[in-house]
Design a protein with these regions (language model features):
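Short, flexible active-site loops
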Residues: 68-77, 85, 106-116
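Residue-level marker for beta-strand->alpha-helix junctions and adjacent short loops that shape enzyme
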Residues: 17, 40-42, 77, 107, ...
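Core AdoMet radical
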Residues: 1-60, 69-72, 98-103
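Alpha-helix N-cap and loop-to-helix initiation/capping positions
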Residues: 48-55, 80-87, 115-123
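Mobile, glycine- and charge-enriched loop segments
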Residues: 1-2, 9-12, 57-76, 128-144, ...
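Alpha-helical scaffolding segments of alpha/beta enzyme cores, especially the outer helices
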Residues: 3, 20-27, 55-65, 87-94, ...
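Active-site glycine- and acidic-residue-rich loops that bind
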Residues: 13-18, 52, 75-90
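Auxiliary Fe-S-binding modules of radical SAM enzymes
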Residues: 90-191
Length: 191
């Protein structure tokens, strides 16, 4: 497919990877590797126990070392504090990631986070603004859960969001390309 569509930018998301495995992906035409930090180093043990925060950081460093762009962010609403979100932003800045997906938890019954209280939309907008301040040149992407913002979703574009993942996600529904295009143009931006 890469041979037929030279302008298509390919992104892979395969979890923890060695530099050698990432090089094979790059050789196959991948230009970006997606690997979320998920949360801050401090809060991470509350989110994942199968591997460490450093395992995730090392995968990102390996991807950058071989010349891949990196997409890495986290999920807001796991029980973290605003300080945790800010700490993650500074880690992402230090890692020089190219793109930060902003995910908002959608509690799913039967999961460890099913009873988490929703993060208020204004808290998410404040976080987006802080991320834009910390990472002024990084793509901040709306990702999973942005429908939780309701009528505030457009405001996120004014707070610092400058790209979006559209369509459905792994466990939740998203929005359509047409709705996203309309949202952007209604605010006076060009696509």
């Amino acid at each position: 497919m890469r041979e037929r569509t030279k302008k298509l930018s390919l992104c892979a998301s395969h979890g923890i990877c060695t530099k050698e495995a990432l090089q094979k992906l790059a050789n196959a035409g991948i230009s970006m590797y997606h690997h979320n930090l998920e949360t801050s180093r401090r809060f991470y043990p509350n989110v994942c126990t199968s591997h460490t925060y450093d395992d995730r950081v090392n995968t990102i460093k390996n991807a950058k070392a071989i010349g891949l762009n990196v997409c890495s962010g986290g999920i807001f609403g796991l029980g973290e504090t605003i300080e945790d979100r800010i700490d993650m932003a500074f880690d992402l800045k230090e890692l020089k990631v190219n793109s930060v997906p902003i995910n908002i938890l959608t509690p799913i019954p039967g999961t460890p986070f099913e009873n988490n209280k929703a993060v208020e939309p204004l808290e998410i907008l404040k976080t987006i603004s802080i991320y834009r301040f910390i990472m002024p040149k990084t793509h901040l992407r709306y990702a999973g859960g942005r429908i939780k913002l309701g009528n505030y979703v457009k405001t996120g574009l004014k707070c610092g969001i400058n790209s979006a993942l559209t369509g459905n996600f792994l466990t939740t529904t998203g929005t359509t390309i047409e709705k996203d295009k309309n949202m952007v143009t209604e605010l006076g931006y060009k696509i």
